[in-house]
Amino acid sequence: MLPELGFLSLLFATTAALLLSIVPQIGIWRNKPTLTNTAWGLSYCFGIFTSVSIGILAYSFATDDFTLEYVAAHSNSQLPTFFKVAATWGGHEGSILFWLFTLSLWLVAFAFFSRKNDRTFSAQTLSLLGLICLGFAIFILFYSNPFGRTFPAPAEGRDLNPMLQDIGLIFHPPLLYVGYVGFAVNFAMSISALIFNRSAQAIARAMRAWVLVSWLFLTLGIVLGAWWAYYELGWGGWWFWDPVENASLMAWLLGLALLHSLMVTEKQGAFNYWTTLFSLLAFAFSVLGTFIVRSGALTSVHAFALDSSRGYVLLLIFFLLTVGSLSLFALRTNSNESAVKFPLISKTGAILGLNIVLTVATVSTFLGTFYPMLFQAMSWGSISVGAPYFNSIFLPLLTLVLFAMAATLCLSWFKTDKKRFFKRLLLLIPAAVIAYGMIWNALQNDGALRFHFFAYVLLTLAIWVLFVTLWQNWVKVKLAYFGMILAHCGVAITTMGAVMSSYFGSELGVRLAPQQSQQLGQFEFHYDRFSNEIGPNFTAEVAFFSVSEQGKPYAEIVPERRYYDVRTMTMSEVGLDAGFWGDLYIVMGDNLGKGEFTFRLHYKPLIRWLWLGGILMALGALCSAINLKRKRDE
């Protein structure tokens, strides 16, 4: 009975979305406030019905209701309860319903916070959000219904994919979805501004708060995903240039460009075109990311759906959103933009340069991600575009981004003090010395490493950004700029962690039997013993290592190989000793008999700085959003 109630709630939600997309529009264009004001009540109704639907699905997982085909395919009675609940969004149908639920949260939030604003504009925005909700609700009803029954019910479920049985994967998709879907708000606001022929400056401050929160969650989702890839997939890296990773990166880059563009638009009335365009594309690329994950069109470790027909529907939604919004943008832009002149060598000019670089990075990522699919669709054969392409593009672009970031702090909005600018420029000298010292120390610890010029340049610029950011605000930190300080420091720290761990880490593949040792740089790994253990829904082979540094005990590390009976899958669980200055990392490979295994030993310097920098970026966005709310309340 409960699953039927969940499906019925989904039908009611679809009806509410349909009414929301039509009734307020009638009120707006016929000047009938009573009909216009229905936007708020219908938004709350949609949120309630969607919440009931996702809640019933989660309850079905928690109670092992294997009469639901979706539950039977993605859960098991032996699965720990928190993984059962997380399995709600572990497959295609549940993830799309969760996507819709997240969209309903943003819809309700906008309805709540806009109730005292311009009623006509807010109702138009809510109605557009309702139209987006309607599209995805119809998609779920006809192509991705998670409430389908199966009779007779299987005695046991197929279990959740072992790759997803991890604490990181409980929070990673929700954070990404909140970030992705949040861009729908600024998308709808921009469309409303185009419909009412308003400039982006008129809504810049209101839009900026929504973008900050969306970008905050997207940043946390990406950071958590990179952390999961690092410790769960067992390949020693944190970014694979996987199509799904690229999709989140493209949305993140566009969101970052939008934030900087909004700042200029609000302050000077410039960049109206940029602001509107970025706000439209950020959400369109979020939908594109959903298509990549759930269509199976591109090979990805994240793509768990292989039904291409559902992918075509998502692609159609992406096409309608993109073409429709860009067509309206093209029709309306001539009357929106007023010429605002500014010196090229200024803070505004530096932000313009930053936005151009971020746009090039997004386009380059898009081409690298979809070129293999186009190549195959045209029957030209198959081709793979991997890390060499993306690294060759992003290394010089990241160099420009870091320089532009520092320049925005060194320059003024209109007239720049040259003496002040060159003082900041001189900070490059100590930055270069420190960067060289960090690399020299890494080379001394492992003679197999080599000097990388580009890595040195990036490290120098990252330290320079850190110096300039702190120097600029050391004497008097204004609350208005505190978020910016945290975010810029976060970018610098993340870059330092990425460069040091990627270029100056140590790695070695070995085969070891118990009581054998292996040296890696300044560390000695001693394989103490081996045992077999039984988990709640798996069996495991466990190796115990003790690590010493120059003869002194340093760490105890325990890698595993787990076998999941129901899914008949073997997964490596890395052994990890996490430290502020670096991680020791062991991946357990094939069993060679009598306790002998193959292992991969890693040392990753400053890898933790990646996560620290990401958290600082998110905190920076949070502080900026709080500051905007404080200004609004004053």
Model-derived segments and spans:
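Contiguous transmembrane helix-bundle modules in multi-pass membrane proteins
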Residues: 1-33, 50-52, 66, 243-251, ...
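Membrane-interface interhelical loops and short amphipathic "cap" helices
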Residues: 1-9, 32-36, 59-93, 145-173, ...
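Membrane-interfacial loop-to-helix junctions in multi-pass inner-membrane proteins
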Residues: 29-50, 109-133, 195-216, 241, ...
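A conserved hydrophobic secondary-structure block that centers on an alpha-helix together
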Residues: 11-22, 95-150, 154-226, 234
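Extended, highly charged clamp/arch subdomains and adjacent linkers
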Residues: 2-85, 93-108, 115-122, 135-146
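Transmembrane-helix bundle segments that line or gate the permeation/cavity pathway
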Residues: 50-72, 77, 86-111, 141-148, ...
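Soluble non-transmembrane domains of integral membrane proteins
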Residues: 509-600
